[in-house]
């Protein structure tokens, strides 16, 4: 079933599937935090976005929430004071089961397109993710950027490409 997000990201998916088929290296997401790639203000924008999370609730619209939990301490010596929702596991499972018919209805192209759009949006927030990884793991800046953003995004893309390839056989 055609889907606009699948069409939007088709070139990226095709390149990833080609790399899988040829068993070659290919990366969609730049591992160097270059302003030429990510934008001149990406570093400062990402830091500000991360800083806005400090001392706040990490609000997620999900069912079964019973409380907020906040006990994270940065390895760099300060309390992050970011609160995360605590949910009843069964409520989350039930919501997933309820969503399943919609995911089935949009077909493999729809599911793949949505996953690729998620990766594109995450990539645009790579500097924010890098600051979060750095401040929660203790990794240095470059490692936090590469491991927490483009490398993770490339591995996710690889998984999406494998899933698409297998579903396309059906």
Language-model-detected regions and their locations in the chain:
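Long amphipathic alpha-helix in the N-terminal Rossmann-like dinucleotide-binding domain
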Residues: 90, 94, 112-127, 139-170
């Amino acid at each position: 079933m055609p889907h606009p997000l699948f069409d939007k990201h088709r070139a990226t998916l095709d390149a990833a599937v080609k790399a899988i088929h040829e068993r070659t290296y290919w990366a969609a997401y730049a591992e160097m935090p270059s302003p030429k790639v990510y934008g001149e203000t990406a570093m400062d924008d990402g830091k500000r976005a991360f800083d806005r999370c400090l001392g706040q609730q990490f609000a997620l619209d999900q069912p079964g929430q019973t409380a907020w939990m906040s006990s994270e301490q940065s390895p760099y010596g300060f309390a992050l004071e970011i609160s995360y929702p605590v949910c009843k596991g069964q409520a989350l499972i039930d919501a997933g089961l309820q969503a399943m018919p919609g995911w089935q209805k949009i077909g493999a192209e729809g599911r793949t397109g949505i996953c690729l759009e998620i990766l594109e949006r995450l990539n645009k927030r790579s500097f924010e993710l890098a600051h979060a990884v750095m401040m929660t793991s203790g990794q240095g800046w470059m490692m936090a950027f590469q491991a927490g953003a483009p490398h993770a995004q490339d591995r996710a893309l690889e998984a999406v490409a494998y899933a698409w390839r297998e579903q396309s056989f059906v």
